[in-house]
A protein has these predicted regions:
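Flexible, acidic loop-helix segments that line cofactor/substrate-binding pockets
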Residues: 52-59, 223-232, 249-250
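Conserved small-residue-rich beta-alpha loop and adjacent elements
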Residues: 85-148
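Short secondary-structure junctions
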Residues: 84, 190-192, 250
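N-terminal Rossmann-like NAD(P)+-binding subdomain of aldehyde/semialdehyde dehydrogenases
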Residues: 5-101
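Hydrophobic packing residues within well-ordered alpha-helices of enzyme cores
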Residues: 138-141, 182, 244
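Internal helical hairpin/lid segments
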Residues: 29-31, 35, 240-250
Length: 250
């Protein structure tokens, strides 16, 4: 009898665990898409004071750049966009959630959000080390995120130091130097370690004025601090630079 009740108790606890933390993929998509609706409709007005604090703590984070980042995330987490992103993959629900360390960059506002999204949508537990350059907006977004999940979901954690800790997997973004540091301290975990990156643009001279305006945005958005900001141009011989200057300086 004792063994029977022990077995029933174990099954019940397992059920509670799965109910609490391992929602279905579609459940997670539905909740995450609600975040996008809130970000687009209410975030900028509801949290303008926090946005101003972020601009003071990091002068590179202007209200304009923060607004652009928030609206970009709201587009990213629309239900149709999430489904289009995930549809090419065969995704199985995890038998147990893994602890995934995310070491976030802070070069542009909320740059670590996509890593956070990737971990959550797969049903795993993010363990976040914030960048000192983006330690106002990201916790704010995460708290809003948690409010959308069931009240018993509390699987997002923050840490200040990775030394002496173990993780199932690691996602880091940093410099070539910091990559060596992370490789050493996270040597036993599965990992994605991003180093310095630069983006280039190759023009052949047939670009429309609209495309050139788009290129200007790719160069100057976020003051060029993003790894996807174009920092090098390849132009054909004899290219009329005034075509670029008209878009760059207007």
């Amino acid at each position: 009898i004792l063994l029977f009740f022990s077995f029933i108790s174990h099954c019940f606890n397992l059920f509670l665990y799965k109910y609490k933390y391992l929602m279905t993929l579609q459940d997670r998509i539905n909740i995450i898409s609600e975040l996008g609706i809130y970000l687009r409709k209410n975030f900028l007005e509801d949290h303008f004071d926090s946005i101003k604090i972020a601009t003071v703590k990091n002068p590179w984070f202007t209200v304009k750049s923060i607004t652009n980042a928030v609206l970009s995330i709201s587009d990213m987490v629309e239900k149709d966009m999430l489904n289009a992103w995930l549809n090419p993959y065969t995704i199985k629900e995890p038998s147990s959630s893994k602890n995934v360390l995310i070491i976030m960059a802070g070069n542009i506002p909320l740059v670590g959000f996509h890593d956070l999204l990737s971990v959550i949508i797969m049903g795993h537990n993010p363990v976040i080390k914030l960048s000192s350059n983006d330690n106002v907006l990201m916790p704010l977004i995460i708290n809003i995120f948690l409010d959308l999940f069931p009240s018993n979901y509390n699987q997002i954690k923050f840490i200040n130091d990775v030394k002496g800790r173990s993780f199932d997997a690691v996602i880091t973004t940093g410099t070539d130097n910091s990559a060596n540091y992370f490789k050493y301290y996270c040597k036993d975990a599965k990992k994605i370690i991003r180093k310095n990156r630069r983006s280039i643009a190759v023009l052949d001279g047939s670009e429309s004025s609209q495309q050139i305006k788009g290129l200007a945005n790719d160069i100057f958005l976020y003051y060029g601090l993003g790894c996807r900001n174009v920092s090098k141009l390849y132009l054909p011989c004899g290219y009329d630079l005034n075509i670029l200057f008209k878009s760059f300086y207007l």
